[in-house]
Regions:
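Amphipathic alpha-helical coiled-coil/heptad-repeat segments
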Residues: 106-152
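DNA target-recognition domains and sequence-specific DNA-contacting regions of bacterial/archaeal
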Residues: 1-109
Length: 152
């Protein structure tokens, strides 16, 4: 685990901390399929990553998942649990998660084949959302360009 002050912007391995921005480091800590959680903050949304990465000391990486759960299924489930994590975080100045909070999660244990069906569907939807955000960004850039040139 790394301290955020040691992060680099031009390394080759993703470095996850509690920010939305992914930083990079020249060395990795884990080579896993994992669900990554910020250990403190005001919101607790997971990230999914499969490969080599580094991790801030105040982040959790959930990996080597039990065989009755697909990691992506667990990731999608965890995306629905922000309010649970906010309610169960501890601390008076900065809300923090503890390992016990994860252990108490009540995860629906459905057949692995059904999990895979859900994953396929949700992955398709997520891909479409990302693609649409890219298109929207291009439209916004085009609009700014037109507005800046129309009223010169």
């Amino acid at each position: 685990m790394q301290d955020a002050s040691l992060s680099y912007s031009d390394g080759m391995y993703p470095f996850f901390d509690r920010s939305e921005d992914i930083k990079f480091q020249p060395e990795y800590l884990l080579d896993k399929e994992a669900i990554i959680y910020p250990g403190e903050g005001s919101e607790f949304y997971p990230r999914y990553y499969n490969g080599k990465f580094a991790l801030h000391q105040r982040c959790y990486a959930i990996y080597d998942i039990a065989p009755n759960f697909a990691t992506r299924y667990l990731y999608f489930f965890c995306k629905t649990q922000n309010s649970y994590f906010v309610r169960n975080a501890v601390g008076s100045t900065v809300a923090s998660l503890r390992l016990d909070t994860f252990k108490r999660l009540n995860i629906p244990n459905i057949p692995i084949e059904l999990q895979k069906t859900y994953i396929k569907l949700l992955d398709k939807i997520e891909t479409k959302i990302v693609d649409n955000k890219i298109v929207l960004k291009k439209y916004e850039e085009q609009k700014r360009y037109l507005l800046s040139n129309l009223f010169i």
